[in-house]
């Protein structure tokens, strides 16, 4: 059978919070079967927040969670890494309200999980299987999921910027055949430097810098080291989508398609999916009857 996964040992990391600009300490701790991904805020009495769509409260520029007044911001890159490596059960301790931004991609979190090691557990892994097409729209933006044997993301973005358009704004990734670790994990978040400077004057985005984002001028990329991928912009948006989808609580089996999507539309899609239980099912699989194994290479090489 395909089994649930946790990490083998506790592992720690430290980084800057994108909102506060302060140092955030994070610890990943192994968890038992069916525990799920849960955040624990050590700075507010060890309060817990489950990583699930039901607790999403923030969708502007990033995805944040809240439970009984306790918030955890900017979870999408960490959730994307957990999804890519099939981590079902882990406790994430934080001493702040936000996950550290690290370098603006999910690669540091992938490295962190791999450093801890991955432990297969004794219980069947649960998959979120899409059985019908579910679509949401907001203006000319739209997102949908449909039935698919495996996991695939097809996305088109539309940014009025020379470098973004030159890089390629359309991409489809079939994760049964293409490696998340190689093709997606190193893609960084991006934005206009003038917008960051304006927000910082308002005491916002205090941790944002060229160390954790691709900074854009009106017509160029300002980072001295340039781009990590030729089409890094659309790849980062796919990284975000993988993280947002993992807030369904299980790895998705289906095809996500979108145009000009963001965290808001992803949240609307997840809420719509969960409100239509006849369009999906939670399933377990034996090795020989599973759908085309998404993340197959990444999962096997990570054990």
Curated annotation (Swiss-Prot):
Cofactor: Zn(2+)
Gene Ontology biological-process annotations: lipid A biosynthetic process
GO molecular function: metal ion binding; UDP-3-O-acyl-N-acetylglucosamine deacetylase activity
Active site (UniProt): 263
Top-level lineage group: Bacteria
Binding site for Zn(2+): 77, 236, 240
This enzyme's EC code(s): 3.5.1.108
Pathways per UniProt: Glycolipid biosynthesis; lipid IV(A) biosynthesis; lipid IV(A) from (3R)-3-hydroxytetradecanoyl-[acyl-carrier-protein] and UDP-N-acetyl-alpha-D-glucosamine: step 2/6
Protein keywords: Hydrolase, Lipid A biosynthesis, Lipid biosynthesis, Lipid metabolism, Metal-binding, Zinc
GO CC list: membrane
InterPro entries named among the record's database cross-references: Ribosomal_Su5_D2-typ_SF, UDP-acyl_GlcNac_deAcase, UDP-acyl_GlcNac_deAcase_C, UDP-acyl_N-AcGlcN_deAcase_N
Catalytic activity line of the entry: a UDP-3-O-[(3R)-3-hydroxyacyl]-N-acetyl-alpha-D-glucosamine + H2O = a UDP-3-O-[(3R)-3-hydroxyacyl]-alpha-D-glucosamine + acetate
Gene3D superfamilies membership: lpxc deacetylase, domain 1, lpxc deacetylase, domain 2
Protein task: Catalyzes the hydrolysis of UDP-3-O-myristoyl-N-acetylglucosamine to form UDP-3-O-myristoylglucosamine and acetate, the committed step in lipid A biosynthesis.
Matching PANTHER family: UDP-3-O-ACYL-N-ACETYLGLUCOSAMINE DEACETYLASE 1, MITOCHONDRIAL-RELATED
Family: Belongs to the LpxC family.
Protein name: UDP-3-O-acyl-N-acetylglucosamine deacetylase
Organism: Vesicomyosocius okutanii subsp. Calyptogena okutanii (strain HA)
Lineage: Bacteria, Pseudomonadati, Pseudomonadota, Gammaproteobacteria, Candidatus Pseudothioglobaceae
């Amino acid at each position: 059978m395909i089994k649930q996964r946790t990490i083998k040992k506790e592992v720690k990391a430290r980084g800057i919070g994108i909102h506060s600009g302060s140092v955030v300490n994070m610890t990943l701790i192994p968890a038992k079967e069916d525990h799920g991904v849960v955040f624990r805020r050590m700075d507010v009495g060890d309060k817990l927040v489950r990583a699930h769509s039901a607790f999403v409260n923030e969708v502007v520029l990033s995805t944040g969670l809240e439970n009984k007044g306790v918030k955890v911001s900017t979870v999408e890159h960490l959730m994307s890494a957990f999804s890519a490596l099939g981590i079902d059960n882990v406790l994430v301790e934080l001493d702040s309200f936000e996950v550290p931004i690290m370098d603006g991609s999910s690669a540091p979190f992938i490295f962190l999980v791999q450093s801890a090691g991955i432990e297969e557990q004794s219980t069947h892994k649960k998959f979120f299987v899409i059985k019908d097409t579910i679509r949401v729209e907001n203006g000319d933006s739209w997102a949908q999921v449909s039935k698919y044997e495996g996991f695939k993301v097809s996305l088109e973005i539309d940014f009025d910027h020379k470098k973004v358009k030159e890089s390629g704004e359309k991409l489809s990734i079939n994760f049964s055949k293409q490696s998340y670790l190689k093709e997606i994990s190193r893609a960084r978040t991006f934005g206009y430097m003038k917008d960051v400077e304006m927000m910082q004057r308002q005491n916002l985005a205090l941790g944002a810098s060229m160390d954790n984002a691709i900074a854009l001028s009106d017509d160029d990329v300002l980072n001295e080291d340039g781009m990590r991928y030729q089409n890094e912009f659309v790849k980062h948006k796919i990284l975000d989508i993988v993280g947002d989808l993992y807030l369904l609580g299980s790895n998705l089996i289906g095809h996500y398609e979108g145009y000009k999507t963001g965290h808001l539309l992803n949240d609307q899609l997840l809420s719509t999916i969960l409100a239509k239980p006849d369009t999906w099912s939670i399933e377990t699989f034996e090795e020989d009857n599973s759908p085309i194994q998404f993340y197959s290479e990444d999962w096997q090489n990570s054990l």
